[in-house]
C-alpha cells in the first residue's frame, strides 16, 4: 500500500514548545525528582521517582492527569487516527459466539453482538428457547465491570460467578439459583486469584488473601494464600479455612473437587513455576495425602476413575507426560506412563471418556485422541496449520467442541464426534476479512548464540520486500507461555493498511518445553532480549522492513522485553510500545503478586551477582542521557494491580527526562482500568487506534490510501 510521507520533526515542532536545551526535544510535563537511594550489597541505587509508587497520592494523581493530557494532545494531531478507529470499529462489529457447554437441562454459550462492551452469557433449553442468563453490560454504567469466571454445581441448579470491577484482580463472588436466576443474599468480597469449585449443593471452595490496608489495595504485596469453604446460607465471616495462612504459608493455593465429586485436590506454589499437590478422599474422609512436595516440578490431576488417579506432570519429563497411580499410594515412584513424553511439548484435555493430547511442534498444534489405557484412537485432522483449543467436556458427552485459528484465519468453532472422529463447522464468524488475500509464513533465524528461533510473519499478498513496510515485531518470552498463531482484528487492520505482523517464539516461552523456558530465566534472561533483537535484524536484513519502519511491541513480561530491548539497542526500531510492563527489576517483587515471579527473574536480594545482572538490564535503570530512543508510547492503567503502574510511570519519566532527539515519549494511562482483562470494547478499540496511528505517524506516514 502507498503512503504519503510527512516530516515528523515538523509536526513535533508545531505541536509543543521546545526545550531550551535541545530544540529537537518536546517540552514534557514536569516530573519532580526526590532524593532517595537504596543499597544493595554495598551499591547505592538512586530512585528519584520513588514517589510515583504511591498511585493513590494526590501529587501522583495530578501528575497522571498532566501526562494523560499531554499524550492525548499529541495523538489528536495525527490526521488518520479517527480513520483507523473507524476501520477498527467496522471490522470489530461482527457476532462472536463461544463454544457451548451443558449444565443441568440447559446449554450455555456466550455471545457478543459486535460492539457490546462485554459478552453476554445465554442459555438454551431442550425446546430450543434461548434467553439471557447473565449480562455483564448491566453490571456497571460504563461496561468496565466484567464477568471473571462462572462455576455451576454438578446438577446445574446453582451457579457462583465472580466479577472484576475496573479490571482489578480483586473479585466479588455472587451466587444464583440457576433455575430462577434469583440472587442469593450472600455475596463474597475481596477474592483474588481464585477458582470456584462446588461440593454437591452444600457450597464451594475458593481462594483469597488478607486484603492490604486501605490506601495500598492496588499495590500492597499479597502473600499467604488461603483456601476457604463457603457453605450456602452462611456469612462469609463464617467460612471454614481449609488450608493456607500462617500454618501453611504458600503464595498461591488453589482447590478443586474432581468431576466424580470424590476428591478434593489442592495445588500449592510459591512461584509461577513448580507446585506441591495434595489430595483428600472425601468418600473415605481421609486427611490430605501428599502426592508431591517441594517446587521442583509441575503436577496436576487430569482425571480420576475410582481409586485411579491420572496425573499430568513434567516431573522427569520436561515436555510433560500423563501418568497414572492410585489413591492408596500416589507417590512418584508408583507412577506409570499412560501417554509418555515425546520431543514435542504436551497438553492434555479430557472429554467423552477420552484423553486429547495436544502436541506443539514449532508453535503449531497437532492433536491426538487416546483411550484411558493410553492407546491411540486417532490423530485428529485439523482444518489447517495453527492453534486448536478445546476438546473438553463431561465423560458422557459424545460431541465435543474446539476452536481453530491462526494469524490469518478468524477463530472457527468445530463440533467433534469422539466416536466417528468427524469434525463439522459449528460456528464460523462473519468477519470482514478474506484470508485468501493474506500470507502467514514461518521462518527460522539464528540468535546471537547460535540458537535457532521460529518466527511467524503475516502480511497482505503482493508485498514488496523493499524495506519500507511498516512492521510490528511482537513477542513475550517468559513464564512458559507459548505464543501460538491466533487471529486478531487489530492485526487484520494493520495488514490491510500494508503492515507486517511478526511474532518470534523466543526463549522464556513454552514452545519447546521446560528447557526452552528455563533458558530465558534468571541469569539467562538476556537470551530473551537477544532473541528479540535477532528477529528484528532478520526482518531488516531480508527486506521485510527497516529500522525506520519497525515498531517493537509487548505487554506485561513482553513490556519488559520491549523496555530492555530499546535500552540495549535504541537504534533497532523507530517505535516502541512497552505495555503494562515489568520495568523496575530491582523492586518488582515488592508489589502485589510480584514476588511470585522470582522463578523467571530472580530478585535483587538473592545475591550480589543476581542484583548486578538485574540492574544491568532493568529498563528503569538503563535509560542514558544523550541517547536517541525510539518514538515511544509507554502503556499502563491507573488501576493495574497485577503489574503496578509505577513501573511505567518511572520508565516513562526517565525517558522523558533523558531523551535527546525529536522522537516523542508518551505515557498512555488508561483511567479506571486494570492489567488488561475485562476492558470494554470501546477501551480496547481506542487503545489500538492510538497504537496503530502512532506507529504509522512516527514512521513518517501522513495519510492512508
Swiss-Prot record:
Cellular component GO terms, alphabetical: cytosol; periplasmic space
Compartment(s) where it occurs, according to its Swiss-Prot or TrEMBL record: Periplasm
Keyword set, alphabetical order: Hydrolase, Periplasm, Protease, Serine protease, Signal
Gene Ontology BP terms: proteolysis
InterPro entries documented for this protein: AB_hydrolase_fold, Pept_S9_AS, Pept_S9A_N, Peptidase_S9_cat, Peptidase_S9A, Prolyl_oligopep/macrocyclase
Catalytic activity reported: Hydrolysis of Pro-|-Xaa >> Ala-|-Xaa in oligopeptides
Main localization category: periplasm
Active site per UniProt: 556, 675
Residues annotated as signal peptide: 1-20
EC number(s) on file: 3.4.21.26
Pfam family, one: Peptidase_S9_N
Family: Belongs to the peptidase S9A family.
PANTHER family per the UniProt record, alphabetical: PROLYL ENDOPEPTIDASE
Subunit-level organization: Monomer.
Biological role: Cleaves peptide bonds on the C-terminal side of prolyl residues within peptides that are up to approximately 30 amino acids long. Has an absolute requirement for an X-Pro bond in the trans configuration immediately preceding the Pro-Y scissible bond.
Full protein name: Prolyl endopeptidase
Taxonomic source organism: Elizabethkingia meningoseptica (Chryseobacterium meningosepticum)
Higher taxonomy: Bacteria, Pseudomonadati, Bacteroidota, Flavobacteriia, Flavobacteriales
Amino acid at each position: 500500500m502507498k503512503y504519503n510521507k510527512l516530516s515528523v520533526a515538523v509536526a513535533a515542532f508545531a505541536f509543543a514548545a521546545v526545550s531550551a536545551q535541545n530544540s529537537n526535544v518536546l517540552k514534557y510535563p514536569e516530573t519532580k525528582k526526590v532524593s532517595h537511594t537504596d543499597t544493595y550489597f554495598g551499591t547505592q541505587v538512586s530512585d528519584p521517582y520513588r514517589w510515583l509508587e504511591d498511585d493513590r497520592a494526590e501529587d501522583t494523581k495530578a501528575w497522571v492527569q498532566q501526562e494523560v493530557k499531554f499524550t492525548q494532545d499529541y495523538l489528536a494531531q495525527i490526521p488518520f487516527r479517527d480513520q483507523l478507529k473507524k476501520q477498527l470499529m467496522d471490522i470489530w462489529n461482527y457476532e462472536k459466539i463461544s463454544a457451548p457447554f451443558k449444565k443441568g437441562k440447559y446449554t450455555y454459550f456466550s455471545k457478543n453482538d459486535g460492539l457490546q462492551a462485554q459478552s453476554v452469557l445465554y442459555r438454551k433449553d431442550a425446546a430450543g428457547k434461548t434467553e439471557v442468563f447473565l449480562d455483564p453490560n448491566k453490571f456497571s454504567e460504563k461496561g468496565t465491570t466484567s464477568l471473571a469466571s462462572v462455576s455451576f454445581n454438578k446438577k446445574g441448579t446453582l451457579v457462583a460467578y465472580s466479577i472484576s470491577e475496573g479490571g482489578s484482580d480483586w473479585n466479588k463472588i455472587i451466587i444464583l439459583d440457576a433455575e430462577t436466576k434469583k440472587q442469593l443474599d450472600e455475596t463474597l468480597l475481596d477474592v483474588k486469584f481464585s477458582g470456584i469449585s462446588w461440593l454437591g449443593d452444600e457450597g464451594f471452595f475458593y481462594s483469597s488473601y488478607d486484603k492490604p490496608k486501605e490506601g495500598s489495595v492496588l499495590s500492597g504485596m499479597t502473600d499467604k494464600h488461603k483456601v476457604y469453604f463457603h457453605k450456602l446460607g452462611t456469612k462469609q465471616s463464617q467460612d471454614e479455612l481449609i488450608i493456607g495462612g500462617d500454618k501453611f504459608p504458600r503464595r498461591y493455593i488453589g482447590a478443586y473437587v474432581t468431576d466424580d465429586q470424590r476428591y478434593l485436590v489442592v495445588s500449592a506454589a510459591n512461584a509461577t513455576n513448580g507446585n506441591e499437590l495434595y489430595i483428600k478422599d472425601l468418600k473415605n474422609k481421609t486427611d490430605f495425602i501428599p502426592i508431591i512436595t517441594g517446587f521442583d516440578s509441575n503436577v496436576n490431576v487430569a482425571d480420576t476413575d475410582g481409586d485411579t488417579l491420572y496425573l499430568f506432570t513434567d516431573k522427569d519429563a520436561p515436555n510433560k507426560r500423563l501418568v497414572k497411580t492410585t489413591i492408596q499410594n500416589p507417590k512418584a515412584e508408583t507412577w506409570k506412563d499412560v501417554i509418555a513424553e515425546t520431543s514435542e511439548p504436551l497438553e492434555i484435555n479430557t472429554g467423552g471418556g477420552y484423553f486429547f493430547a495436544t502436541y506443539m511442534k514449532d508453535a503449531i498444534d497437532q492433536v491426538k485422541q487416546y483411550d484411558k489405557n493410553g492407546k491411540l484412537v486417532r490423530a485428529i485432522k485439523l482444518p489447517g496449520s495453527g492453534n486448536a483449543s478445546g476438546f473438553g467436556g463431561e465423560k458422557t458427552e459424545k460431541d465435543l467442541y474446539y476452536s481453530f485459528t491462526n494469524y490469518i484465519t478468524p477463530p472457527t468453532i468445530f463440533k467433534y464426534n469422539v466416536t466417528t472422529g468427524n469434525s463439522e463447522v459449528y460456528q464460523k464468524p462473519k468477519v470482514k476479512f478474506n484470508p485468501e488475500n493474506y500470507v502467514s509464513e514461518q521462518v527460522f533465524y539464528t540468535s546471537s548464540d547460535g540458537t535457532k528461533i521460529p518466527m511467524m510473519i503475516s502480511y497482505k499478498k503482493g508485498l514488496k520486500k523493499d524495506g519500507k513496510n511498516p512492521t510490528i515485531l511482537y513477542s513475550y518470552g517468559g513464564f512458559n507461555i507459548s505464543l501460538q498463531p491466533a487471529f486478531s482484528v487489530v492485526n487484520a487492520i494493520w495488514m490491510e493498511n500494508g503492515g507486517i505482523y511478526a511474532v518470534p517464539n523466543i526463549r522464556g516461552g513454552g514452545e519447546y518445553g521446560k528447557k526452552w523456558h528455563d533458558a530465558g530465566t534468571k541469569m539467562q534472561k538476556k537470551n530473551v532480549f537477544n532473541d528479540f533483537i535477532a528477529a528484528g535484524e532478520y526482518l531488516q536484513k531480508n527486506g521485510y522492513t527497516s529500522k525506520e519502519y519497525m515498531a517493537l511491541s509487548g505487554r506485561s513480561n513482553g513490556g519488559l522485553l520491549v523496555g530492555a530491548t530499546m535500552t540495549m539497542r535504541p537504534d533497532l526500531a523507530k517505535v516502541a510500545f512497552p505495555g503494562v510492563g515489568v520495568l523496575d527489576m530491582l523492586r518488582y517483587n515488592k508489589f502485589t503478586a510480584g514476588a511470585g515471579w522470582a522463578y523467571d527473574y530472580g530478585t535483587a536480594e538473592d545475591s550480589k551477582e543476581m542484583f548486578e545482572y538485574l540492574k544491568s538490564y532493568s529498563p528503569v535503570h538503563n535509560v542514558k542521557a544523550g541517547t536517541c530512543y525510539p518514538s515511544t508510547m509507554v502503556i499502563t492503567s491507573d488501576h493495574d494491580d497485577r503489574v503496578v503502574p509505577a513501573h511505567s510511570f518511572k520508565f516513562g519519566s526517565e525517558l522523558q527526562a533523558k531523551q535527546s532527539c525529536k522522537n516523542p515519549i508518551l505515557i498512555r494511562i488508561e483511567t479506571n482500568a486494570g492489567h488488561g482483562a475485562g476492558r470494554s470494547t470501546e477501551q480496547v478499540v481506542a487503545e489500538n487506534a492510538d497504537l496503530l496511528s502512532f506507529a504509522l505517524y512516527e514512521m513518517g506516514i501522513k495519510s492512508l490510501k
